Amino acid sequence: MGCKGDASGACAAGALPVTGVCYKMGVLVVLTVLWLFSSVKADSKAITTSLTTKWFSTPLLLEASEFLAEDSQEKFWNFVEASQNIGSSDHDGTDYSYYHAILEAAFQFLSPLQQNLFKFCLSLRSYSATIQAFQQIAADEPPPEGCNSFFSVHGKKTCESDTLEALLLTASERPKPLLFKGDHRYPSSNPESPVVIFYSEIGSEEFSNFHRQLISKSNAGKINYVFRHYIFNPRKEPVYLSGYGVELAIKSTEYKAKDDTQVKGTEVNTTVIGENDPIDEVQGFLFGKLRDLHPDLEGQLKELRKHLVESTNEMAPLKVWQLQDLSFQTAARILASPVELALVVMKDLSQNFPTKARAITKTAVSSELRTEVEENQKYFKGTLGLQPGDSALFINGLHMDLDTQDIFSLFDVLRNEARVMEGLHRLGIEGLSLHNVLKLNIQPSEADYAVDIRSPAISWVNNLEVDSRYNSWPSSLQELLRPTFPGVIRQIRKNLHNMVFIVDPAHETTAELMNTAEMFLSNHIPLRIGFIFVVNDSEDVDGMQDAGVAVLRAYNYVAQEVDDYHAFQTLTHIYNKVRTGEKVKVEHVVSVLEKKYPYVEVNSILGIDSAYDRNRKEARGYYEQTGVGPLPVVLFNGMPFEREQLDPDELETITMHKILETTTFFQRAVYLGELPHDQDVVEYIMNQPNVVPRINSRILTAERDYLDLTASNNFFVDDYARFTILDSQGKTAAVANSMNYLTKKGMSSKEIYDDSFIRPVTFWIVGDFDSPSGRQLLYDAIKHQKSSNNVRISMINNPAKEISYENTQISRAIWAALQTQTSNAAKNFITKMAKEGAAEALAAGADIAEFSVGGMDFSLFKEVFESSKMDFILSHAVYCRDVLKLKKGQRAVISNGRIIGPLEDSELFNQDDFHLLENIILKTSGQKIKSHIQQLRVEEDVASDLVMKVDALLSAQPKGDPRIEYQFFEDRHSAIKLRPKEGETYFDVVAVVDPVTREAQRLAPLLLVLAQLINMNLRVFMNCQSKLSDMPLKSFYRYVLEPEISFTSDNSFAKGPIAKFLDMPQSPLFTLNLNTPESWMVESVRTPYDLDNIYLEEVDSVVAAEYELEYLLLEGHCYDITTGQPPRGLQFTLGTSANPVIVDTIVMANLGYFQLKANPGAWILRLRKGRSEDIYRIYSHDGTDSPPDADEVVIVLNNFKSKIIKVKVQKKADMVNEDLLSDGTSENESGFWDSFKWGFTGQKTEEVKQDKDDIINIFSVASGHLYERFLRIMMLSVLKNTKTPVKFWFLKNYLSPTFKEFIPYMANEYNFQYELVQYKWPRWLHQQTEKQRIIWGYKILFLDVLFPLVVDKFLFVDADQIVRTDLKELRDFNLDGAPYGYTPFCDSRREMDGYRFWKSGYWASHLAGRKYHISALYVVDLKKFRKIAAGDRLRGQYQGLSQDPNSLSNLDQDLPNNMIHQVPIKSLPQEWLWCETWCDDASKKRAKTIDLCNNPMTKEPKLEAAVRIVPEWQDYDQEIKQLQIRFQKEKETGALYKEKTKEPSREGPQKREEL
């Protein structure tokens, strides 16, 4: 029956389903097995890994409040009210009841799906970083002495209510504080009043008391109340993090690299190894299922499982033929298990693959599975760009990049999708329709809008189609299709490129723009250039008083007398007289006219009777009507350039770029026949869809606010008492319920159907219709509507004055007409009401009956109009204040739920704006949604409502990548399918995966957690590779992620999520790696074991590895706006106002990339004092948290996600020719590095000024206890032989806690300085996955950014080297202008010739007779290295070569040797590095350093080689061991450092950990 009755009683999972005969047999076998193996007793070994924060635990209650704040501030404050009593004392005192009290309070505001996400979020501790950021901001204040909570009023602090009053009185004398996006502003706060920032812990009694006082002040309009979390007395324990992976990789033991020093294990809490952590499937037995079926046999099952695990765990190598089909066989094994367990099996097989592989080789693969996978792979490649073996994950069609997206950004996607799906569900759109609507791509278009340039107001200087200057150019558009070299600008006699300068002639920037225009014309650039001069257009201002008018009239005079081209030449003469930065004056104009036209009376041109005012009024009219923004403006084919592009150099570059870009557009149009030869080109350009009559930045801005229109209720605005108690969404629903609409054909309302047309655009006009500005807005909207059948209009009243019957006449009349009249009558009547005459007549006492229109039922109207019920206006006023956030009387337009406003009092918003608004809605969303809603067959008025509500919901989504339409792949034989629960909203999740890849190790546990969080329609397609030639997975893996917080049996929080490797094989050598989100820097903090070489046979029970999140990374890209290039060598610092410089960094030339190590909080980014600050200034910044025009760049890190900013810098005017990396780099004279050095006590030492050359910088890297032991011996050998002071630099990333703890003691003993440097491998640089190769990368790829600029030169010495000479000699060695010097490989040991790979093949031809150098010892001249951008060149070459897994096999050595032609190497004399493998014995006596190279012939272990080759090695080793024993004793007795009072003979041991 497919069951192999072998000794172990296994039953292959691939053989048959979980239930049935196999299990009956299996259970019978149990007793036999137990009898056979009852005497076997083997303790199982385990490895656990945890990751905690450096900061203290943050209360879950506070984290919960931040989850709700992300939804809305309203929910945040409601939750604060609901959770007043959940201090940690008010419930029965257990963690469990505290947690459930939080859930109970929060669940009132959350749907069931959101409740699951909320629990997951608390388990992830997502918002711990947010609370910690507030803690850091509070610490920066700092808090006043002895206050548990405190107030900060414009910088002054107190925790006394009385003092608060006094501080409020004087607040206006002090500047307002900078508020952050994450601050919590109380809804009724008055932004004009003094800001009170309240720091406290919600849930505490003190908070409640102060909070009530502040609310009453806020409601009275006296303060702007802002709340920030502050925990006076945090729990002194860290936060356990999750959302990371732990890899246990099997190391090659070809060369033995284990230290033989015995390690004492530490006590480990054995509850860490949980009872219920079984790997579900062992040799075909699904133990979880067995335990459910046979609870009575639990003890025996446990023993059986243990035996089976131990019998399978030892790994025997597989033959090549057994490897070939492993991917398909693993897929077959997964797909044969019951569907509900398939993900569990996939997780188990991929995460424990090395021990599962042998059993998997016995699995048969069906031809159906193989064929279906191969068929699907054609689609995967064609539609998704996936190769066999690649992985991908899609959630509702959104691509989740598994390499770059961490669990925190994935959580954001889930939460956002949930919001939209639940919104659509509430609107009655469900199932497949919901997913179809979701897939609509309705992002606001990125197209740049253009205005029409076919206006007589433009004075065109030239015309390419008629001017004789261009006669020699070809005039056919076919020329566009003629091939040319890239970047060549084609000269064709067509006005393809039109540039309009809209300027105020008297402004100081105009001269520069004139010069640019002149440059374009004189260089025959194919541009038609026009001007619009915007000047004072009042008739009594003439050109003898006003320079602007003078320029305009001078231009017009010459244009009429000669032509526009000469008129422009005259202007250039005028502006040439103006000094840079000054304005043109009337006398400049007069002197040029007198000189060029001496026979004309200047006064007749410029004076009061001038006839040369052409376009004076029209120009201003065009400028105002097009709404293009503040002057000067430059239009290219009608599209305005951005402000920063108007800098003269920038404008030149960007224009050339635009010409090339639009040429491509025209080529396509000509090729497709859209632009025939005889068509006017300008007409063609102006008929493009992005051309609008007016550009209104309010409408086109990317910052958009939307109403939430998804709620539904049966309330209306005419019940004011009920309306006031609704929440924001409820109020919006009531307003929408109460709307009656005007439309072009008439009015369609719930009762009256004289129209069957879905209108995709809905405008709500908000204003005080009893004031002229409100009526004007309404009138313009109605006028626009006359030309459009897509629009419906309704009104919201926002009265400016206190509401009374008398002052709301027109508002009441409009309301009454909407309530009582037919569509046409209402529209005609309201149009009359909106005209100014009506209001004046009514105010003068006219009867409303005079305005009656045909078809109106006046008596019905009058009844409602004269009713004293004012509820609708009261409700509208409250709605405007609380939801729309408008002041009394302010106007706004709400278009399909998008709030445009508040409009300024004098701001124009006319028909053209409504036209633009309608255009945009129809193009991006309206039409698409309308066609979907039509398919739902709902009644017309409801349908128009639905379009509006769906549009608001979808458009409010953050802009992201479009959803991918995946074809329906075949899923009968090759996919895991989990169906969603019926009748509930579900996520559509598609995964493509090869089950024997690193991605599968991460994806399987992630999908298992998702399955517990969300209802999903899941399909996991197998994407197997065939013909494998190598073991596909050589590591065990655990992904740390839990769907909910867990508790211990006594109702306390369990000790955080941890990774557990149970039942591991004991023979292999493992290395442990953490796989964390990109922006995390973690370090190993506590473990006595060597995590680089874990050998379980020598371990007592558990290897517990503890890591700490040391930093969150702030990354950025920086460009010089003038050159568009990264400012190589520019330095930034990051700090706080109290401590301005905490870390600093250098900008790379690659992508202008920089990174800074930070932690949660608010930080200030500055240019580093010295050359960076002298030469540059920060021009603009993006992705930061301070306003663009603020002096300081503030960055708030308040979550665990990546933060990437963009900074543009500009050279100061007097520094344009200075070079950052030029030789005067005394960057450091009194800079940061000095201030950051300190002695052992942590106090700053007085800086003993040392000449730079007086110190030798030695860099080294090590990982694992053996290499750290070698490293200490190398250091000792250097110190014994070198007389000059030494400073060691170590790469911190991979040092063990033991080494980091001992090194200060050793530094004190031997009187040297040291520094730990670190750098996170940038995400854009090809990643290495193997630890050894990553370390090699650090030896060569980041040398320019790893060290501060003060370090001019350093020596790299490998950890396993012994130095026998004074290294000053090497430091001073002349490199003859090369950036670095390496020693070539020895040639003298002849018997090794067969291993010298550089003597043949690629290397022999590439080196062309040069030497191949060894990377164990080198010297780098950093000044030269940076100057020739060696680092950037090395990274560039690495990026290209490293994509090929077969290149750079010795990365740190092959790369510099490969780059020998671009980055020259100076060959050091041979005696600088002797190594027994390659050098003969005779040369050993001359050796200045001895390296313990691996020997590929003998494979001798390093330790044995060291003792045999280097006589002094054992003495050094003993000396260090004695020091370690002494250190350990002092540590245990607490005497560490106490007696170390002797004065160091030279500048003492110094340490600065951060770079």
From Swiss-Prot:
<dbReference type="Pfam" id="PF18403">
    <property type="entry name" value="Thioredoxin_15"/>
</dbReference>
<dbReference type="GO" id="GO:0051084">
    <property type="term" value="P:'de novo' post-translational protein folding"/>
</dbReference>
<dbReference type="GO" id="GO:0005783">
    <property type="term" value="C:endoplasmic reticulum"/>
</dbReference>
<dbReference type="GO" id="GO:1904380">
    <property type="term" value="P:endoplasmic reticulum mannose trimming"/>
</dbReference>
<dbReference type="InterPro" id="IPR040692">
    <property type="entry name" value="UGGT_TRXL_3"/>
</dbReference>
<feature type="region of interest" description="Glucosyltransferase">
    <location>
        <begin position="1244"/>
        <end position="1555"/>
    </location>
</feature>
<feature type="region of interest" description="Disordered">
    <location>
        <begin position="1534"/>
        <end position="1555"/>
    </location>
</feature>
<dbReference type="InterPro" id="IPR040693">
    <property type="entry name" value="UGGT_TRXL_1"/>
</dbReference>
<comment type="function">
    <text>Recognizes glycoproteins with minor folding defects. Reglucosylates single N-glycans near the misfolded part of the protein, thus providing quality control for protein folding in the endoplasmic reticulum. Reglucosylated proteins are recognized by calreticulin for recycling to the endoplasmic reticulum and refolding or degradation.</text>
</comment>
<dbReference type="InterPro" id="IPR040525">
    <property type="entry name" value="UGGT_TRXL_4"/>
</dbReference>
<feature type="short sequence motif" description="Prevents secretion from ER">
    <location>
        <begin position="1552"/>
        <end position="1555"/>
    </location>
</feature>
<dbReference type="Pfam" id="PF18402">
    <property type="entry name" value="Thioredoxin_14"/>
</dbReference>
<dbReference type="GO" id="GO:0005788">
    <property type="term" value="C:endoplasmic reticulum lumen"/>
</dbReference>
<protein>
    <recommendedName>
        <fullName>UDP-glucose:glycoprotein glucosyltransferase 1</fullName>
        <ecNumber>2.4.1.-</ecNumber>
    </recommendedName>
</protein>
<dbReference type="InterPro" id="IPR009448">
    <property type="entry name" value="UDP-g_GGtrans"/>
</dbReference>
<keyword id="KW-0597">Phosphoprotein</keyword>
<keyword id="KW-0328">Glycosyltransferase</keyword>
<dbReference type="InterPro" id="IPR040497">
    <property type="entry name" value="Glyco_transf_24"/>
</dbReference>
<dbReference type="GO" id="GO:0051082">
    <property type="term" value="F:unfolded protein binding"/>
</dbReference>
<comment type="similarity">
    <text>Belongs to the glycosyltransferase 8 family.</text>
</comment>
<keyword id="KW-0808">Transferase</keyword>
<feature type="signal peptide">
    <location>
        <begin position="1"/>
        <end position="42"/>
    </location>
</feature>
<keyword id="KW-0325">Glycoprotein</keyword>
<comment type="pathway">
    <text>Protein modification; protein glycosylation.</text>
</comment>
<keyword id="KW-0256">Endoplasmic reticulum</keyword>
<dbReference type="InterPro" id="IPR040694">
    <property type="entry name" value="UGGT_TRXL_2"/>
</dbReference>
<dbReference type="GO" id="GO:0005793">
    <property type="term" value="C:endoplasmic reticulum-Golgi intermediate compartment"/>
</dbReference>
<feature type="modified residue" description="Phosphoserine">
    <location>
        <position position="1277"/>
    </location>
</feature>
<dbReference type="GO" id="GO:0044322">
    <property type="term" value="C:endoplasmic reticulum quality control compartment"/>
</dbReference>
<feature type="glycosylation site" description="N-linked (GlcNAc...) asparagine">
    <location>
        <position position="1228"/>
    </location>
</feature>
<dbReference type="GO" id="GO:0032991">
    <property type="term" value="C:protein-containing complex"/>
</dbReference>
<dbReference type="Pfam" id="PF18404">
    <property type="entry name" value="Glyco_transf_24"/>
</dbReference>
<dbReference type="Pfam" id="PF18400">
    <property type="entry name" value="Thioredoxin_12"/>
</dbReference>
<dbReference type="GO" id="GO:0003980">
    <property type="term" value="F:UDP-glucose:glycoprotein glucosyltransferase activity"/>
</dbReference>
<keyword id="KW-0732">Signal</keyword>
<dbReference type="InterPro" id="IPR029044">
    <property type="entry name" value="Nucleotide-diphossugar_trans"/>
</dbReference>
<comment type="subunit">
    <text>Monomer as well as in a tight complex with SELENOF. Interacts with METTL23. Part of a large chaperone multiprotein complex comprising DNAJB11, HSP90B1, HSPA5, HYOU, PDIA2, PDIA4, PDIA6, PPIB, SDF2L1, UGGT1 and very small amounts of ERP29, but not, or at very low levels, CALR nor CANX.</text>
</comment>
<dbReference type="GO" id="GO:0070062">
    <property type="term" value="C:extracellular exosome"/>
</dbReference>
<feature type="glycosylation site" description="N-linked (GlcNAc...) asparagine">
    <location>
        <position position="536"/>
    </location>
</feature>
<dbReference type="Pfam" id="PF18401">
    <property type="entry name" value="Thioredoxin_13"/>
</dbReference>
<dbReference type="Pfam" id="PF06427">
    <property type="entry name" value="UDP-g_GGTase"/>
</dbReference>
<dbReference type="GO" id="GO:0018279">
    <property type="term" value="P:protein N-linked glycosylation via asparagine"/>
</dbReference>
